[in-house]
Amino acid sequence: MSSLGRLHLITDNRPGQDPLAVVRAALSVARAELVVQVRVTDETTDRQAYDLARRVTVLCARYGATCLVNDRLHVALAVGADGGHVGADDLPVGAARAVLGSAAVLGATAREADTAVEAVAAGASYLGVGSVHPTTSKDGLPPPIGAAGLRAVAAAVSVPVIAIGGVTAADVPDLRAAGAYGVAVIAALSHAADPARATAAFVEALTC
């Protein structure tokens, strides 16, 4: 999937955050190189998730960027997103593929080579692999897999591998060397004082 963007922005809609402002800033810099994954808190209603995903889908379309919806695949279908992403506790990859259809982009989360191979066989278009570093963006995660774990997964599959978990722009060269096609971030953009400038740093690192 050579057309998949290398920088994945996962939205943060927790109190005090403005996900649409961050998406706009990131799109203005990364344009079609950006993939926006609409992820919302468990407390977010489907209507709220729909409203956010619909607006993000429209923004992404203006730049030729990809919009995915995490977990809530019915929302992805309702807003006409490009696809979705499922984690370990979400729908099985095969079931998610059946829901979204053969043409959709479908991401899946993996930490180990065997589960990565299974996810690809079930229909995953790309894999989000990690957490590669410690992160505070999600509670209850297992220990980070590091560059060695990322390398093992990347060597086992032929689809793009997206490194996630505590990633900074400075980490990109080492992650690319370990086999990552791109990176996924939350705090590095959503909590940045200047999201556009932070996006530019990632784009530069990913295109070197």
UniProtKB/Swiss-Prot annotation:
InterPro entries: Aldolase_TIM, ThiamineP_synth_sf, ThiamineP_synth_TenI, TMP_synthase. GO terms for cellular component: cytoplasm. Keywords: Magnesium, Metal-binding, Thiamine biosynthesis, Transferase. It catalyses: 2-[(2R,5Z)-2-carboxy-4-methylthiazol-5(2H)-ylidene]ethyl phosphate + 4-amino-2-methyl-5-(diphosphooxymethyl)pyrimidine + 2 H(+) = thiamine phosphate + CO2 + diphosphate; 2-(2-carboxy-4-methylthiazol-5-yl)ethyl phosphate + 4-amino-2-methyl-5-(diphosphooxymethyl)pyrimidine + 2 H(+) = thiamine phosphate + CO2 + diphosphate; 4-methyl-5-(2-phosphooxyethyl)-thiazole + 4-amino-2-methyl-5-(diphosphooxymethyl)pyrimidine + H(+) = thiamine phosphate + diphosphate. Pfam families: TMP-TENI. One of its GO terms (molecular function) is magnesium ion binding. Binds 1 Mg(2+) ion per subunit. SUPFAM superfamilies: Thiamin phosphate synthase (SSF51391). Its cofactor is Mg(2+). Pathway: Cofactor biosynthesis; thiamine diphosphate biosynthesis; thiamine phosphate from 4-amino-2-methyl-5-diphosphomethylpyrimidine and 4-methyl-5-(2-phosphoethyl)-thiazole: step 1/1. One of its GO terms (biological process) is thiamine diphosphate biosynthetic process. 2-[(2R,5Z)-2-carboxy-4-methylthiazol-5(2H)-ylidene]ethyl phosphate binds at residues 135-137, 166. 4-amino-2-methyl-5-(diphosphooxymethyl)pyrimidine binds at residues 37-39, 70, 109, 138. It comes from the Bacteria. Mg(2+) binds at residues 71, 90. Its EC number is 2.5.1.3. Belongs to the thiamine-phosphate synthase family. Condenses 4-methyl-5-(beta-hydroxyethyl)thiazole monophosphate (THZ-P) and 2-methyl-4-amino-5-hydroxymethyl pyrimidine pyrophosphate (HMP-PP) to form thiamine monophosphate (TMP). This is Thiamine-phosphate synthase. The lineage of its organism: Bacteria, Bacillati, Actinomycetota, Actinomycetes, Micromonosporales. The gene is thiE.
